[in-house]
Regions:
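Conserved pre-ATP/AMP-binding loop-to-beta segment of ANL
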Residues: 33-34, 145-193, 200, 223-229
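Conserved structural elements of the adenylate-forming
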Residues: 51-58, 171-174, 185, 204-225, ...
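Gly/Ser/Thr-rich phosphate-binding loop
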Residues: 160-169, 277-282, 291-350
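Conserved helix-loop-beta element of the AMP-binding
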Residues: 115-117, 135-149, 228-231, 257, ...
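Conserved AMP-binding/adenylation subdomain of ANL enzymes
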Residues: 212-229, 237-278, 293
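AMP-dependent adenylate-forming
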Residues: 5-6, 23-48, 65, 189-191
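Conserved AMP-binding/adenylate-forming core of the ANL superfamily
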Residues: 35-65, 69-86, 103-108, 161, ...
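Structural core segment of the AMP-binding/adenylate-forming
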Residues: 63, 90-165, 178
Length: 350
């Protein structure tokens, strides 16, 4: 018999019994038997122990550099971004994922509204964006940008070894007590901003309960298991990328495969084939790219058991084109940032 809530009334009570997402992640990481926690399509794999070590090391650096509550993050889907996200949440701070595609005015406005003093980012990422004509460093006159590469260089070999041993030897309860700050499930965990296409970007505050409940709902409805491999290609400034393809699998002990560019469908399909990816979530615009790309083959997509579209209306030509080429249906999710983000999804007939 299922122990999961089955009614609306049950879901009114159940979320209060959940752990914050970073605590759920910690417990899963200590128990997980999967080969890796996070990988990128180029082949760099991070084990659960190394991921935990990274979170513990990085959280200490954030404590030293950023005493304020709201912490900015300017990164694409990546292992470093996932580690930084969990580290920030574990400190009881509010994570502000900034939309690096929104333009200078919208980004500056978002950082100012959220009173972000420090933004953690990557020199490699900033250089790539500069090549595309975006000088992101000039977008934040009132915030200081801190580079992950510089922070890594500051961490001694001894600190890495000692922290790795703690990650391996200490039980989850002791790590939580030693490193994590106590939070209320009603505290604001994250602020996600709209794109600003209809005026100034609007910040949406999501509590720990919002995120934990929606992640658990998604895991239940998608029947996600640690035998799955989730393709994490949506950016974490997007609610679906943040909650459904990053935090949900991490909290459930499900491996994720990251790629920074959701439009790079040929590389992503190669990653699906390489890692036997089982769940792909994307916007209809991105899914259409799989159907029209000659580099994305039928064979490369056959490990997938579930493809879900969200963020915009799934047009019949996209759904039919995907099913015709890959012989698999596309299911449609609906939600908004305010619903953390998932509100509904259609599922396979049972």
């Amino acid at each position: 018999m299922s122990t999961h809530p089955t009614s609306f009334a049950d879901w009114q009570v159940y979320p209060s019994k959940l752990d914050p997402i970073h605590v759920a992640w910690l417990k899963s990481a200590k128990k997980s038997k999967t080969a890796f926690a996070v990988a990128d399509i180029e082949g760099v794999e991070i084990s659960h122990k190394k991921f935990l070590t990274g979170v513990l090391l990085f959280s200490k650096k954030i404590e030293a550099y950023s005493p304020e509550q709201n912490i900015g993050l300017l990164l694409p889907s990546s292992g470093g971004g996932a580690i930084a996200s969990i580290a920030i949440l574990s400190l009881g701070k509010t994570l502000v994922n900034l939309n690096f595609t929104a333009g200078k005015k919208a980004l500056s406005s978002a950082a100012k509204q959220a009173e972000v003093k420090h933004i953690y980012t990557s020199r490699k990422f900033l250089d790539k964006m500069f090549e595309r004509g975006m000088d992101l460093e000039s977008y934040f006159p009132d915030s200081k940008l801190l580079m992950l590469e510089d922070i890594r260089e500051e961490i001694s070999t001894l600190s890495r070894i000692v922290t790795l041993l703690k990650a391996i030897l200490l039980p989850a309860s002791m790590i939580q007590k030693s490193y994590f700050k106590e939070v209320s499930m009603n505290d604001t965990a994250a602020i996600l901003f709209s794109s600003g296409s209809e005026g100034s970007p609007k910040g949406v505050e999501l509590t720990h309960m919002n995120i934990a409940a929606n992640a658990k709902q998604a895991a239940i409805e998608l029947e996600a298991a640690d035998s799955d491999v989730i393709m994490s290609t949506l950016p974490t400034f997007h609610a679906f990328g943040f909650a459904i393809t990053t935090l949900m699998p991490l909290s459930e002990g499900i491996p994720i495969v990251c790629h920074a560019d959701p439009k790079d469908v040929s590389t992503i399909s190669s990653g699906i084939q390489k890692y036997s990816g089982t769940i792909l979530v994307g916007t209809p615009t991105f899914l259409r790219m799989y159907t029209i790309s000659k580099k994305v083959t039928y064979e490369s997509m056959q490990s997938l058991r579930l493809v879900v579209a969200g963020a915009e209306k799934l047009r019949s030509e996209v759904r039919d084109g995907f099913e015709k080429k890959f012989k698999m249906p596309v299911y449609e999710g609906y939600g908004t940032t305010e619903t953390s983000p998932g509100a509904s999804v259609n599922l396979p007939d049972i």
